[in-house]
Amino acid sequence: QTAIQNAFMLKEDFQYMLVSKDTFFMLLAAGALAPITEYVEGSEYLKDQISEVGWDLVTKDGEIYGVPQRAAKNCAALGLAYRADWLKDYNEANPEDQIDAPSEENGYSMCVSDFRKMLEYFNTRVAKGGHALGIGNGVTCMTEILPAFGVYQKWMETDGTVQFMTEQPGFEEYAEYMTGLYDDGLVYYQATSNDTGVIAAFQSEMAGVVEAAHWEAYTLETVSAPEGEDLSQYTDDNIGYISALVPDDNKGDASAVRVWSGQGYNSICVLPSYNTAEQSAAVVDWMDKKLEPELYRESVIGVEGETYTVENGEYYPILPEFNDRMGYADKLISGNREEDNSKYWLARTRKTAAQDKLFSTINYNVDNTGIKNPVDMMSTNDAYDNYFSKANTDVSDQLVLMLFNSAEAFDLQKVHDIWVADNGDDITNSITEWYNSWGSKDIYNEVKAR
């Protein structure tokens, strides 16, 4: 950030720069950015290809000061990997008390009581010394489990106040559920980075359920692949994925599924205030021309038949050509065809069949189930910037002691007191004030709480 500041202060010879959202607001406050409203309004593609939410982010006093870069896809990155073969064995042995497997019909969900029942059975199947559910180091709030208790994001508006997750209604019930699992010996918690990781625990049958990111699927699924198998196309039918848990009252109801998703604007193209009008006009025109549909597609994913194929309207990479020629292409764009990019980017999640399996499962119907964190769209905020990191760390450390340590019972009041002592009320009030003045608050999350 200091280097960027210096580049602007010294009026170095550049016409535009890609900066982080936080740096954008710092430069905007310093008066270092050129307004580009008239050029955006006169563009052929640019204005219409970026959402109202995006333009709102970079607008101040009616002037546009940057071209926002949205994350390619509204999606969840994490899901629960589970031993599908063990669940099948349980159901065959218990025809009168079966557990519904995650499927398209139920939105790849499972209700909380069935999940616990599955863990109880898995505890009889793990290797000696293992536990049914493996939870990674530092993880206290499992985003696949929290929605079952009404906690849909790290920050959510409730009755006019934007609340941190531990302050939201439902968190106490979540914590009691998790402590119950731990106290009954169903959970392995990776206490330090030197302890066995949960992916390794799953691979060695020391755990039957773990949280996994979609980029970890290849490691999970290919460990038992037959010799000579094409690993890029291999998936293991013994492994399945859960997108989220639902309340028992919503068992089997795909419309009740809610997942933590994300799609913020993490970077912004900006122009220095010392640009001439001709320079600014030329830069925006250049960005606009790159959004011509055919040129944009070729810039992002290459040429059909050479770097990608299209199957049923979906884009799939041709390897290794896609990696060799287009590996970093999505990092070099300035301005997006947002809707098109959300389809093209999926080719990057399909580099292996295993990754495609995990990603597509946990993001099944995500446009109707995913809830995003509004704070991802917030401008600079003194209370949040100054206090939140410490408050978040202190609360998380306390949750580790309470959730994964039988010696200390969960105490919501104690968690709340830590939050307050770390200026949590100031953070909450400041975020709420911003949120209530945010022009896009009513359209940012199209999916609502259950």
How should these model regions be labeled?
Residues 398-450:
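Histidine-centered catalytic/metal-binding microenvironments
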Residues 22-79, 140-179, 227-262:
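Hinge/lid segment of periplasmic solute-binding proteins
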